[in-house]
Amino acid sequence: MKLKKNIIKSALIGLLGACTFSSCSDFLEIEPLELIVLDKFWNEEADVENVVAGCYSAMQSQNVIDRMMAWGEFRSDNVVGGTNVENQKDLYNIFKENINASNSFTTWVDFYNIINRCNTVLHFAPSVAEKDPNYTESELRATKAEVSALRDLMYFYLIRTFRDVPYTTVAYLDDNQTMDLPATKFEDVLDSLILDLESVQNDAVKKYPVTKEYYQRGRITQDAIHAMLAEMYLWKQDYASAVRYADMVIDAKTVDYQNELDKMGSRVSVTDRMIDGYPIITDGSATGSTYGNAFEAIFGRGNSRESIFELIFMNNNNMPSNGAVSSRYGNDRTFPGSVKVADFIGTDVPDEVYDVFLSKYDTRYWENVQALSKTLYGINKYAYQSVLIDMTKAELKSDAVSYASAYAQDYCHANWIIYRLTDVMLMKAEALVEMASNNDSTDVGKQQNDTLYKQAFAIINAISKRSNCSTGSKELDYSKFNTKSQMQELVLAERQRELMFEGKRWYDLVRRSRRDGNTNFLVGVVSRKGSSGGTAISSKLSRMDAIYWPYNNDEIKVNKNLVQNPAFSSGENDSYERTGK
């Protein structure tokens, strides 16, 4: 594959880059790279830690986060092309659903680079433990669990995007190794990832020292692995297991929260209380006169108690910044960025349509969407650090909402969240609904289904309630959502409202399509984008193959074992082959 030399080169440079920040010895500048990797570099625990740090640094790159955004969000109904998008051909074609194999967003080399870094650590770390007596067996196991999880996360992104992908757990260290691997089936890769994570979950760090402020949410923990397993089991359609792992995360977060409350003692305020038994952050102030507290904690300051795993960008202009968010969602110079809110979402509340949000009192509309005019709406989430919704105004509309300044163009410090608590709670809700029988004709069947629906509904209601700034009732009405199809749509709609612009929506729609065995639901919701790309979607996305992405043309040329997704051409002429379903 084309990524062969890139993987090896990047892995080696990753070692060098990690050492640069750690003041490694000067021999790195004069020895051949292969000798560094195979001989002199891997001697003590610090060497291993440096390479692990390099894995996280690679994940922070603009190319990686850009693809997390594009693959998980840009084909969905949430977004359309923004400022000057017509000058960015590849991005523009995504929004027009005119994707071909030459589109730069189909490249995956940065993800495979991270995978190989992880495989390299797994290859060399045991020998380091033999040399360094201070590198204990438990620390070695924790390292292996950490990089295994990072590797599995990268593969999870790849299979959700491309479906079948080349899969290996072998480190590539020289050009003589075989790289032209055929694609492994989605189901086989998913099973391997689950097996791997379950084998290492208990070895991962549960709690980092409190002195390491950002480690608990900026590095892999047991909670992060359990969140990954909950989601993977959703895709596997093993819903009981998805619930089991989601509960592990929810229970762990609840214990952490209770421990924090115990430390606070009498200083506990209204805003510190759980919502319906869940340790989620209250969005309103203690008096209820303003809202935006949860948004600022989760997306502004970041590293919140709801976070499970996020890519952390330090609030320091001398450190790396989140260039992907700055470019795509916007900054102090250009807002909206090259991606903006879909028109039907932007007008949903102002025009009182409520196809997406349940009412104008859902604070997530005001926190996610910023109106620049009656026809132009920017993505506020991640681009801005805080939102203040003033409930003392006579009426809740745009003049009751104020926004802090956007991040500076070259200094966006917004963390990119991969897993947070409400995401996992909604995974559980989805799994509970899917556990219900499709045949509830008997009284026993109806009762069993009703129990599952009510459990799922309670989760959704708690999440919805925290974002409801109405002075009246904040409760959803269960009587409107007590069938399986109604509950399925409620879960997916709540995931859209809660996780909007976080790189989740397209994957949610693909997962729904895999479960349904067709793309009817996906096409129906994505077509809501209308003239901004939706009208051409019905025919292009009518076949299941088309909801994935094509392999990049360069990969096909150099790896003869890769067979192109049948929905896509070579990329040199058309985007889609003119074939039937």
Give the predicted meaning of each segment.
Residues S23-F27, Y56, M68, V80-V85, ...:
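Long, intrinsically disordered, low-complexity segments
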Residues E49-N63, N84-F162, T184-D188, L197-V210, ...:
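Conserved, well-structured interaction surfaces
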Residues M1-L33, S441:
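Bacterial Sec-dependent N-terminal signal peptides
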Residues S25-Q88, V165, L190, D196-A204, ...:
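An aromatic- and glycine-enriched ligand-binding surface/loop that stacks and positions planar moieties
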Residues T347-L421, M427:
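Flexible, polar/acidic helix-loop-strand segments at domain edges
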